[in-house]
Amino acid sequence: MEFWNIILFELGGKPVLLIDLLSAAFGLTTVFLAGRNSKSNFYVGYIYTALLFFMFWQKNLYANLILQPISLGINIMGQYRWSHPKKSEESSEKSGELKVSMLTWPQRGIIVSLVLVLAFVWGWFMSMMGTRWFVGYFPANPLPYLDCCVTVLILTAQTLSALKKWDCWIAWLFVNVANLTLYLKAGLVFMPVVSCLYLVNGIWSLFTWYRLYRKNA
């Protein structure tokens, strides 16, 4: 356990642990490969999910920990969908590979509504934890609604990415901006830098996938 908690360096007076650096590196590699339309992103994603599970377990962040099996399931679904498209979904450039597609506007409206409702309901429950419910057992979340909105957006972005929807990168951009806000408010230094790298990759991938979409339109 102590091996993973080795302090590699300090940034802005905050220690950066080995587990933090590894998680950031594998996370960035996963989205980088996904943005380049590489199926290898799923294999790296499995390692990333395992690292997050271990990190959240160590830090007693059980709300985040229980999401990792869900992320694992989405990753498995994505690997299958990208490799086993229906004939009408097959890429014109690569046989046997899922093409990039887009959500319709009605579908976007439904997803946005679901994200807002789920984030509000989950945020309300989290706002009660440590303040009115289980006081002394759970630390109060200073930004419950923003935190829950980010979590719901992450699961939404992962699902859309697994289905190879261009819109996933829009969701990821919202996630990156929200995460950047959360990390800065928490006084962190290393994670905002990582979030900026995610943001740059998200913008690049948005245009990369749009070009792929146009080729198959």
Q: Can you annotate each of these PLM segments?
A:
Residues M1-N37, G73, W82-E89, E97-A217:
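Polytopic alpha-helical membrane-helix bundles and their juxtamembrane interface segments
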Residues L33-I47:
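Membrane-interface helix-loop junction between the first two transmembrane segments
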Residues G45-V100:
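Hydrophobic/aromatic-rich structural module bridging two neighboring secondary-structure elements via a short loop
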